[in-house]
Regions:
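Extreme N-terminal starter segment of soluble prokaryotic enzymes
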Residues: 1-3
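Conserved GNAT acetyl-CoA-binding A-motif
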Residues: 105-116
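Short beta-strand-to-coil "C-cap" segments at the C-terminal boundary of structured domains/repeats
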Residues: 142-148
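Conserved active-site alpha-helix within GNAT-family acetyltransferase domains
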Residues: 95, 119-137, 143
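Residue-level recognition of the GNAT/N-acetyltransferase active site
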Residues: 85, 118
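Conserved acetyl-CoA-binding loop-helix of GNAT-fold acetyltransferases
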Residues: 84, 90-103, 129
C-alpha cells in the first residue's frame, strides 16, 4: 500500500471512490458532479487529499480542509472525508490514512485535526484508538441555507 498527496491528475481514479463515499451517505450517484467538485477544490487549492493505492489501484482517500483557530492563533485542518473501498476495509488502510494526515499536520506545525462523525459510525473506536478525543467542551451547531441557488 502507498499513500501520497493527490493532484488534479488523479481525479479520474478518485471519482469512483468519492462517488461511492457520497452514496454511502445516502446521496445519489453522480460521478460528473463528483468530478466537478474535486476539480474545483484542486484548481482553487482548497483541499489536501491523500490517496491510498494498492498495486497502483486507488482504494481509499482522506480529504482535509484548512481553517484557523483564533484563540490559539494557529491553523488546523478539518478531516472532512475518509473512505476506503468496501473490499479493502479491515486491512489497516483507514488507519494508515489517518496517521498520514496526523504526520502531515505535525510537519506543517498545525494545531491539529478536527473531525465529525455520525453517532452510529463504528470508526469512532478507531479514532479514539489513534488519539482523537471526543470534545465534550463544546456543542457544534450548523445553520442550513434553505434558499435555492440562483
Amino acid at each position: 500500500m502507498e499513500i501520497r498527496t493527490a493532484t488534479q491528475n488523479d481525479i479520474e481514479s478518485i471519482v469512483p471512490l468519492f462517488d461511492s463515499y457520497r452514496v454511502f451517505y445516502r446521496k445519489s450517484s453522480n460521478p460528473d458532479d463528483a468530478r466537478s467538485f474535486l476539480s474545483e477544490r484542486f484548481t482553487k487549492n482548497e483541499n489536501v487529499l491523500f490517496l491510498a493505492t494498492v498495486k497502483g489501484k486507488a482504494v481509499g482517500f482522506t480529504q482535509l480542509y484548512k481553517t484557523f483557530s483564533s484563540v490559539s492563533l494557529k491553523p488546523f485542518y478539518i478531516l472532512n472525508d475518509l473512505y476506503v473501498a468496501q473490499e479493502y476495509r479491515k486491512l489497516g488502510i483507514g488507519k494508515a490514512l489517518l496517521e498520514h494526515a496526523k504526520s502531515f499536520c505535525r510537519e506543517k506545525d498545525f494545531k491539529g485535526l478536527a473531525l465529525e462523525t455520525a453517532l452510529d459510525n463504528p470508526a469512532q473506536k478507531l479514532y479514539e484508538h489513534l488519539g482523537w478525543e471526543l470534545d465534550q467542551s463544546y456543542l457544534h451547531y450548523f445553520w442550513t441555507n434553505t434558499q435555492e441557488s440562483i
